[in-house]
Amino acid sequence: MRPRGTPPSFLPLPVLLALAVIAAAGRAAPAAAAAPTADPAATPALPEDEEVPDEDGEGVATPAPAANASVEAGRATLREDLREIKARDGDATFYVCPPPTGATVVQFEQPRPCPRAPDGQNYTEGIAVVFKENIAPYKFKATMYYKDVTVSQVWFGHRYSQFMGIFEDRAPVPFEEVMDKINAKGVCRSTAKYVRNNMESTAFHRDDHESDMALKPAKAATRTSRGWHTTDLKYNPARVEAFHRYGTTVNCIVEEVEARSVYPYDEFVLATGDFVYMSPFYGYRDGSHGEHTAYAADRFRQVDGYYERDLSTGRRAAAPVTRNLLTTPKFTVGWDWAPKRPSVCTLTKWREVDEMLRAEYGPSFRFSSAALSTTFTANRTEYALSRVDLADCVGREAREAVDRIFLRRYNGTHVKVGQVQYYLATGGFLIAYQPLLSNALVELYVRELVREQTRRPAGGDPGEAATPGPSVDPPSVERIKTTSSVEFARLQFTYDHIQRHVNDMLGRIATAWCELQNRELTLWNEARRLNPGAIASATVGRRVSARMLGDVMAVSTCVPVAPDNVIMQNSIGVAARPGTCYSRPLVSFRYEADGPLVEGQLGEDNEIRLERDALEPCTVGHRRYFTFGAGYVYFEEYAYSHQLGRADVTTVSTFINLNLTMLEDHEFVPLEVYTRQEIKDSGLLDYTEVQRRNQLHALRFADIDTVIKADAHAALFAGLYSFFEGLGDVGRAVGKVVMGIVGGVVSAVSGVSSFLSNPFGALAVGLLVLAGLAAAFFAFRYVMRLQRNPMKALYPLTTKELKSDGAPLAGGGEDGAEDFDEAKLAQAREMIRYMALVSAMERTEHKARKKGTSALLSAKVTDAVMRKRARPRYSPLRDTDEEEL
């Protein structure tokens, strides 16, 4: 407040506006509060010498109330109301502030210079294509030509055979045979010539003369290759018991395989696991003879205008190619020649980014992509593609990708700024960046173009970065190595994201805070003239009293007083001066609980003034709210009416909320530089494929189901066949008959031998031998009997009857010998001779039947002649003797 008697100083317009707002709020506050009742709860007794104002506003002299007059019965006392306020709103401390004497003076600090608000980095939006190191090998189709040579040594026993050794080797197919036989006719020679221990050796299939054998498709084929061969079965030598025999098998194999080669492409490996120490790009065309090779010149041949033939269908290719053929000690390999550029590229495209922001951070660029959640750091100097070895594909693929993305997304809203730029980022990533400019800022195109030109390497033209250099590389080239993990770029993206957000937020807060303090300093300087005590207290941080001493403030420390030691009077009228009233309530207080009572006047914000000089003319309709303790007291017509808590008065906040943007959520997506398939396929040799092919080789080019059993007579038949084969057509015809007869004999003998080798057959043969021995014994006895007594042996029954008939005669007397009949004896002899003739005729007829028809007829004629012979000279005997009759 200004000193008394001095005119009010001129206030600036912002201060006047602020004071007007405060005054309007002060006038609105009583209206917002509850209107006092007609019969207030605590209406003080008016003094007798103070007049009560009427409705017209003219005051009537009425006596002033006493200093501590009590209220009427039935109304709450002021002390009780204050106690309720303190119990409800909490305790509040009062302060007694003595007037400052000028012993301590203070001044406000001058405005400070504020930091500049961060205006952000120089961002450039654009399209990016990120390239990585190409770890995939160069793959191409190759054809292997070789002959599997197998020499087996077998020992044959009587009942079994045993392999004593197997020699296996591979021999290359000569160039002439590949061109004139395999590719021209689909056949292969049955011989194999190869060098081992510096000596040339020749193997003949089946140990026979050289001939052409047709190639047939392999029985089992893989998804990536085909194969052809000439024979399924291994040749085994002929069986000769107790001798060692040798047999040779030559299997000509043509196999399509996959070949791989990795940087620097000095060698390649076949899917079978065989290494070829020659660059796949070696040849005699376009300067390719400078590529690496480890073989002599006569082992390599390059054929122009080569038409490859499909050995399965016999069809010839429609277009000719340049064919490379190389002979190694084990095989011959052929492949289609191709130039090194652009067949291979040391870089490959990794990601296409539709939105890539490029920000300047000191001497580096940071390329950020929200889609990839990554930030790549690169030098601000462009990277020349001519420094990368075999990178012709980068410029072509980058331009194609940029043009495709631009036409799809930015064709109607943006324009391209300059050419595609290339930057080598940390981790070995090559970024092809195409800056874009929106159509709204197209007028800045020239400025941006000039800026881009200044960033180019010294001495470079505008098309150098986008257009690959000449085919001849500079003397020193390098290969970009890309890390297998991109986590560092993702961490960089996270750090940049948080750093950008926090730095922008804190920078703007610091700038706004500084500017606010400087602006508030002006208000503080003007407000201290109105209420220096409040300004000084707010500035110092504790309750003080202050007054202006020119351009400085004199301050004094306030003494705190407990709320229980403060008593408020319920009337603010001045008894001695009619028409004059106190502008603020009167209070009595004690510094200590048992100290003397001191009179004072309630100031602002619970300040107790030791002087009661705050006066004003009494007015009609007086209503005031005064802060007392933790609440408010309401005075109406200069008398206490009732109390209010702070919550009963509508609060108008002067606090300015600090609206800070929270850090936005961001989800990381899985990101791989190289997939599992790329890592698996990055090696020069695929061991899985090698093992699969090696184990499938026997199934593809050999018959594993057919079993050849050793034949002891194979040598005999082979010799006979060779003998009759050399006699021409007649010899072959005779040979068939002889071979049939010999085969029958051998089969019979083999059948008997097989029967005897059977246990049941041996038992049967043993029984037959015993039966034969028994029959021979009985036959021998019969022959001996026949020699001793033919009649008894031949006619045992007749002899027995004759013997029984002659027995009585012999036993009847001595005259028996004399009675012997000579005629009967002669008849008996005749009968024996007749029986011998009959037996001879039967034997003759039996032999004639065996000899044939002519002999049988001769026997019949002889029989007829014998039957027509003269009648015998004897007659049959009668049953009774004539002498007896």
UniProtKB/Swiss-Prot annotation:
Residues in the signal sequence: 1-34
Annotated Low complexity bias: 29-46
Entry's Gene Ontology BP terms: symbiont entry into host cell; virion attachment to host cell
Disulfide bonds: 97-558, 114-514, 188-252, 345-393, 581-618
Annotated motif Internalization motif, positions: 874-877
Start and end residues of each stretch annotated as Hydrophobic membrane proximal region: 704-757, 716-756
Disordered: region residues: 29-74, 455-478, 866-885
Protein name: Envelope glycoprotein B
Organism: Herpes simplex virus type 2 (strain SA8) (Simian agent 8)
